[in-house]
Amino acid sequence: MIIVTGGAGLIGSNIIKALNDRGHTDILVVDNLKDGTKFANLADLNIADYMDKEDFLIAILADEDFGNVEAVFHEGACSSTTEWDGKYMMDNNYQYSKELLHWCLEHQVPFLYASSAATYGGRNADFIEERQYEQPLNVYGYSKMLFDHYVRDILPEAQSQVCGFRYFNVYGPREGHKGSMASVAFHLNTQLKNGENPKLFAGSDGFKRDFIYVEDVASVNLWFWENAVSGIFNCGTGRAESFQEVADAALKYHQSGDIEYIPFPDKLKGRYQEFTLADLTKLRAAGYDKPFKTVAEGVADYMAWLNRNA
């Protein structure tokens, strides 16, 4: 069996799809379906079982027998960068992850987990997987950084695979449940489909992010699992592309609309990463050599998927 926490979310459900494509269907999905709309991300996938995340944690703490577990992909977390309830964030993203990590180490189960580029904070260069480059801007980024530090301390003695991925700006199929936290590409498509002009923050040609297509993220996860590589790795494309380029790709697909520029919100000032760019030195040195989709390629693919599945 393979366990995927956050399996009904964007990255988790795409990992399940990639596993299905490789013939794996004995999959336990762990999630919180209080937001029932997330079921749609699993509707076309083949899984063996589902557990609520609270019930799963109780089972882990009680050391219940899950049989032969081949891997745990831990994608479940509160991923809202605008959530400021620190206790909730630390319980969800830090304590829960520690419990699951220790269960995996005890049972010699490969543990692959979601970290985040939010650990780097507001820097504009050197997004490198080392302590001196980490200074998060929000409690979400802090919770991810703290767990990475915990993992770093454990790695030298770990007898089974422990692998973290610092996801950069992930977008693609199965993110419709995320609301305001969905990608710019998702929101632009919705606006264009509704006959509206797509909206960007003023200055978006200068805001550059490392946008990575979610299928590429799933590919990275499965390659590292199959090759039993441990460590903490950036998961981005190694390119910084502007929000303007995302909008241009959406407009090209829809063949309509003009961009409207709206003022940058005061509440995000000083808490917003204006630039991200994954340093892929460690990822490539580990042996992952597949290319990553550009924004033009990924957004075109995503627009086709969104409008095919509307």
From Swiss-Prot:
<dbReference type="GO" id="GO:0097171">
    <property type="term" value="P:ADP-L-glycero-beta-D-manno-heptose biosynthetic process"/>
</dbReference>
<dbReference type="InterPro" id="IPR036291">
    <property type="entry name" value="NAD(P)-bd_dom_sf"/>
</dbReference>
<feature type="binding site">
    <location>
        <position position="170"/>
    </location>
    <ligand>
        <name>NADP(+)</name>
    </ligand>
</feature>
<dbReference type="InterPro" id="IPR011912">
    <property type="entry name" value="Heptose_epim"/>
</dbReference>
<feature type="binding site">
    <location>
        <position position="180"/>
    </location>
    <ligand>
        <name>substrate</name>
    </ligand>
</feature>
<feature type="binding site">
    <location>
        <position position="187"/>
    </location>
    <ligand>
        <name>substrate</name>
    </ligand>
</feature>
<feature type="binding site">
    <location>
        <position position="209"/>
    </location>
    <ligand>
        <name>substrate</name>
    </ligand>
</feature>
<keyword id="KW-0521">NADP</keyword>
<feature type="binding site">
    <location>
        <position position="38"/>
    </location>
    <ligand>
        <name>NADP(+)</name>
    </ligand>
</feature>
<comment type="pathway">
    <text>Nucleotide-sugar biosynthesis; ADP-L-glycero-beta-D-manno-heptose biosynthesis; ADP-L-glycero-beta-D-manno-heptose from D-glycero-beta-D-manno-heptose 7-phosphate: step 4/4.</text>
</comment>
<feature type="binding site">
    <location>
        <position position="272"/>
    </location>
    <ligand>
        <name>substrate</name>
    </ligand>
</feature>
<feature type="active site" description="Proton acceptor">
    <location>
        <position position="178"/>
    </location>
</feature>
<protein>
    <recommendedName>
        <fullName>ADP-L-glycero-D-manno-heptose-6-epimerase</fullName>
        <ecNumber>5.1.3.20</ecNumber>
    </recommendedName>
</protein>
<feature type="binding site">
    <location>
        <begin position="10"/>
        <end position="11"/>
    </location>
    <ligand>
        <name>NADP(+)</name>
    </ligand>
</feature>
<feature type="binding site">
    <location>
        <position position="178"/>
    </location>
    <ligand>
        <name>NADP(+)</name>
    </ligand>
</feature>
<dbReference type="InterPro" id="IPR001509">
    <property type="entry name" value="Epimerase_deHydtase"/>
</dbReference>
<dbReference type="GO" id="GO:0005975">
    <property type="term" value="P:carbohydrate metabolic process"/>
</dbReference>
<dbReference type="GO" id="GO:0008712">
    <property type="term" value="F:ADP-glyceromanno-heptose 6-epimerase activity"/>
</dbReference>
<feature type="binding site">
    <location>
        <position position="53"/>
    </location>
    <ligand>
        <name>NADP(+)</name>
    </ligand>
</feature>
<feature type="binding site">
    <location>
        <begin position="31"/>
        <end position="32"/>
    </location>
    <ligand>
        <name>NADP(+)</name>
    </ligand>
</feature>
<comment type="function">
    <text>Catalyzes the interconversion between ADP-D-glycero-beta-D-manno-heptose and ADP-L-glycero-beta-D-manno-heptose via an epimerization at carbon 6 of the heptose.</text>
</comment>
<dbReference type="Pfam" id="PF01370">
    <property type="entry name" value="Epimerase"/>
</dbReference>
<keyword id="KW-0119">Carbohydrate metabolism</keyword>
<keyword id="KW-0413">Isomerase</keyword>
<feature type="binding site">
    <location>
        <position position="92"/>
    </location>
    <ligand>
        <name>NADP(+)</name>
    </ligand>
</feature>
<dbReference type="GO" id="GO:0050661">
    <property type="term" value="F:NADP binding"/>
</dbReference>
<feature type="binding site">
    <location>
        <position position="169"/>
    </location>
    <ligand>
        <name>substrate</name>
    </ligand>
</feature>
<feature type="binding site">
    <location>
        <begin position="75"/>
        <end position="79"/>
    </location>
    <ligand>
        <name>NADP(+)</name>
    </ligand>
</feature>
<feature type="binding site">
    <location>
        <position position="144"/>
    </location>
    <ligand>
        <name>NADP(+)</name>
    </ligand>
</feature>
<comment type="subunit">
    <text>Homopentamer.</text>
</comment>
<comment type="similarity">
    <text>Belongs to the NAD(P)-dependent epimerase/dehydratase family. HldD subfamily.</text>
</comment>
<feature type="binding site">
    <location>
        <begin position="201"/>
        <end position="204"/>
    </location>
    <ligand>
        <name>substrate</name>
    </ligand>
</feature>
<feature type="active site" description="Proton acceptor">
    <location>
        <position position="140"/>
    </location>
</feature>
